[in-house]
Curated annotation (Swiss-Prot):
Glycans are attached at N37, N217. Keywords: Glycoprotein, Host cell membrane, Host membrane, Membrane, Secreted, Signal, Virulence. Residues 1-19 form the signal peptide. This is Secreted RxLR effector protein 90. Residues 29-53, 135-176 are annotated as: Disordered. One of its GO terms (cellular component) is extracellular region. It is found in: Secreted; Host cell membrane. Residues 166-176 have a biased composition (Gly residues). Belongs to the RxLR effector family. Secreted effector that completely suppresses the host cell death induced by cell death-inducing proteins. Residues 135-146 have a biased composition (Low complexity). It comes from Plasmopara viticola. The RxLR-dEER motif acts to carry the protein into the host cell cytoplasm through binding to cell surface phosphatidylinositol-3-phosphate.
Amino acid sequence: MKSAAAFATFLTLSVFVATTEVQGTPGLRGLRSLADNQSTESSEGRKDHYNHHRHVKKVIKKVKKIAIPVPVAVPQYIPVPISGPSSVIASQNTAVVGSSNNVVAASGAGAVGSGVLGPGGVTPAPTTMTGRPVATPAPTTSVPSSLVNTDTSDNQLPTTPVAASQGGGIGSNLAGGSGNSVSMSGFGGGNQMGTFGNSMFGGRGANTGNGFNGNGNNSFGQQMGIDTPNGNMFGGFGRQGAAGGGGQRGFGGEAPDGINSVASGNALGGGITRRRRRL
C-alpha cells in the first residue's frame, strides 16, 4: 500500500517537472512560435491571393464596359448649288437652258415632262436681283455686214499682212506704202519697197501706177503725164513723167539729163537739164 502511494507521488512529481522544463526552454518556445507564425503567414497569403483575384476580376469587368469608337462614313462629295448663266450645261444631267423658257430641263434619267416635277428633273434658271430671269445674249457674227447683204467690197474684206523687206531706201515703212500690197519697184525715197497705194503697182492710194517720187522706178503720179510725147523710162514731164505720172524714175525732168531724171528724186543721183523739152 505504501509502495503504491509512493509510486503515484513519484509519477506526479515527474510530470510536473517535465512540464515546467518545457515551458522554460527557449528552443521549445521558438518551435512553438514558428508554428504559430507559419499558420498566420499562410492565412495572410491566402487572403492576399484571394484579394488579388478579386481585383483582377474587377479590372476585367471595367475594361469590358469601355465603349469602342466606331468611324462614321462621311460623303466625299457634298452637292453645292452654283449660280451661273442660263446657257450653263450641267455635268451630271447635261441640262440645257433654252432662250425661250427660264427652266432647266434635264435630259438624264430624272427628266420629266413639262409641268411635272421629278427627282432632279427641273431646276429654276438664275435670276437677277429683282427676280427677273437673266436674258440670254443673242448670237453674234464676225462677218462684215456687206457679206450678209451679199454686197462685198474690198475695204470690208480682211487683209493679209506683208512681211518686212530687207532691201530698199529710206522709206517710211518697210514693205509697201500706205496700202496693203507690195510694189515691184523701189530703190529708195518715200517708202522702201512700194507705192502709196494698196495694189501691186500702186493702187487706190496717192497714185495708180507708181510711188511718191522717191522710189527707184516710181514717181508721183500715174503713168499718163501732162505731155504725152515727152516722157521716157528715165524720167520726164510727160506721159511717164512726174506731174501727172512722174515717169518710172524721177519727179520731173526729161530724158536721161532732166532735173530729176536719174536724179535727186530717186537714189541714182541728179543732174541739170541740158536739153530743151519738146512741146
